[in-house]
Amino acid sequence: MDFMKLAREKAKLVEMDDRLVNRAINEGFSGGEKKRNEIFQMAVLEPSLAILDETDSGLDIDALRLVAEGVNRQRSAERSIIVVTHYQRLLDYIVPDFVHVLAGGRIVASGGADLAEKLEAQGYAWLERGGIGKLDVEIRA
C-alpha cells in the first residue's frame, strides 16, 4: 500500500479531512485538530509504545470522544499506550488497564480504573505523600 493511501485510510480513524494529509504537520490546525493529528500519526506509525501527554487538554466533548475512539481502536496486544492526564473525563472513554499516580517525579500510588475514580472524588490529599501529581494511565490490550 502506498503511503498516501495509508494516510487517507488512517485519517478516517479520527474523522480527519483527508485533504489535511497534504499539509505540513499541524500547519493551520486548530487545537482539536492537532490532538486528532497526534492520534492519526500514531495510527500511521504503529509504534509498539505510544506516550500521549495530556492529549485531552483543551478538547471539547466531541473532540475528546473522537480522540478517545481513535486511541481505543488502536489498542492491541502488540502496543502499549501511556496516557498522561490530570482529569478523569478522558478515562470515561478510555478505560485504563493500570493507573499510576506521579508526584514529585515518583509513583506514589498504583491501581486500576477505580484509583482514578477515587482521585476524582477525593482529590490527592488522601495519598500518603500528598501533593498534586499527574495521573499516568497505562493501557494494554
Protein language model features and the residues they cover:
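Walker B catalytic motif
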Residues: 54-55
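Conserved H-loop
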Residues: 78-93
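Short coil-to-helix N-cap segments within the nucleotide-binding domains
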Residues: 58-59
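Conserved beta-strand-loop-alpha-helix hinge in the C-terminal portion
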Residues: 93, 102, 106-129
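Walker B motif beta-strand of ABC-family P-loop ATPases
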Residues: 49-51
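ABC-family P-loop ATPase nucleotide-binding domains
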Residues: 1-46
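Helical segment within the ABC ATPase nucleotide-binding domain
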Residues: 64-77
